[in-house]
């Protein structure tokens, strides 16, 4: 019974190790990562401000 429990525990650990993955080596050449997201947000913020301005103009015309 003890051997069977040990085998089951070993099997569970082996399956968990096979399913898990991680990057073990780190390099400074990864770039800036998520900090570059601001460049992609600029067009969206421009469109948002443009739509807001047009909505204000349209709401002023309906009165």
From Swiss-Prot:
GO molecular function, one term: hormone activity
BP-aspect Gene Ontology terms: flight behavior; neuropeptide signaling pathway
GO cellular component: extracellular region
Organismal lineage: Eukaryota, Metazoa, Ecdysozoa, Arthropoda, Hexapoda
Residue(s) carrying Threonine amide: 32
Residues that bear Pyrrolidone carboxylic acid: 23
Signal peptide: 1-22
Keyword Disulfide bond recorded: yes
Protein species of origin: Locusta migratoria
Compartment(s) of residence: Secreted
UniProt similarity note: Belongs to the AKH/HRTH/RPCH family.
Function noted in UniProt: This hormone, released from cells in the corpora cardiaca, causes release of diglycerides from the fat body and stimulation of muscles to use these diglycerides as an energy source during energy-demanding processes.
Keywords: Amidation, Cleavage on pair of basic residues, Disulfide bond, Flight, Hormone, Neuropeptide, Pyrrolidone carboxylic acid, Secreted, Signal
Name of protein: Adipokinetic prohormone type 1
Keyword ATP-binding: no
């Amino acid at each position: 019974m003890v051997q069977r429990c040990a085998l089951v525990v070993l099997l569970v650990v082996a399956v968990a190790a096979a399913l898990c993955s991680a990057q073990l080596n780190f390099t400074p050449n990864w770039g800036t990562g998520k900090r570059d997201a601001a460049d992609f947000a600029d067009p969206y913020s421009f469109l948002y401000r443009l739509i807001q301005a047009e909505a204000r103009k349209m709401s002023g015309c309906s009165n």
